[in-house]
C-alpha cells in the first residue's frame, strides 16, 4: 500500500518511546503510535522529508 498523501508538511516532535518511524520508497515518513486499547499503530502525521544525510 502506498501511503503518499499530502496531509501534513510540518514536523511534529513527539516522545520517541511512543513513536514508530517507517520509511516508504515514495519519500515520505509515516509517524504512528501504538494505541493502548487496540494496540494498533495510528497515523499522527505524514510529511515529506528531504535527503539531507551524509
UniProtKB/Swiss-Prot annotation:
GO terms for cellular component: extracellular region
Keywords (A to Z) from UniProt: Secreted, Signal
Highest taxon listed in the record's lineage: Eukaryota
Signal peptide from the UniProt entry: 1-13
Predominant localisation class: secreted
Compartment(s) where it occurs, according to its Swiss-Prot or TrEMBL record: Secreted
Protein name: Uncharacterized protein YBR200W-A
Amino acid at each position: 500500500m502506498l501511503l503518499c498523501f499530502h496531509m501534513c508538511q510540518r514536523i511534529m516532535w513527539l516522545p520517541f518511546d511512543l513513536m514508530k518511524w517507517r520509511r516508504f520508497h515514495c519519500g515520505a515518513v509515516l509517524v504512528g503510535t501504538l494505541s493502548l486499547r487496540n494496540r494498533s499503530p495510528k497515523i499522527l502525521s505524514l510529511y515529506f522529508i528531504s535527503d539531507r544525510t551524509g
